[in-house]
């Protein structure tokens, strides 16, 4: 399970180091293979899955009938735009320029461990995310009983 926040540096070739704390987990879960795709819900963010978890997500998304525009858009953003990546000998992955450009990732990024996946945020989008607050209305009835 992935959790925590890590400041990431992206080099001129678009490579970033996966934090050492996660490398063994990624190696065991998916033989050093990850899948990168767009976060369909929030701008400035990419999702990064271990390949084994990605296969479950991909199959679930593609099992939905694409007769609705929202389903097609979800399939396009998640599956159609997915990039398969492999950790190199130094624990780095290369983020495609198309993905970096689309979400505004340049030299600095933030990696969030989100349980079954990572979120890779541009530094600016992450700063805006952290500055947002939640109200009781945002939580809704199902979350009001959380004990945080």
Swiss-Prot record:
GO terms for cellular component: cytoplasm; nucleoid. PANTHER family: TRANSCRIPTIONAL REGULATOR MRAZ (PTHR34701:SF1). The keyword Chloroplast does not apply. HAMAP family: MraZ. The lineage of its organism: Bacteria, Pseudomonadati, Pseudomonadota, Gammaproteobacteria, Lysobacterales. This is Transcriptional regulator MraZ. The gene is mraZ. It comes from the Bacteria. It is found in: Cytoplasm, Nucleoid. Keywords: Cytoplasm, DNA-binding, Repeat, Transcription, Transcription regulation.
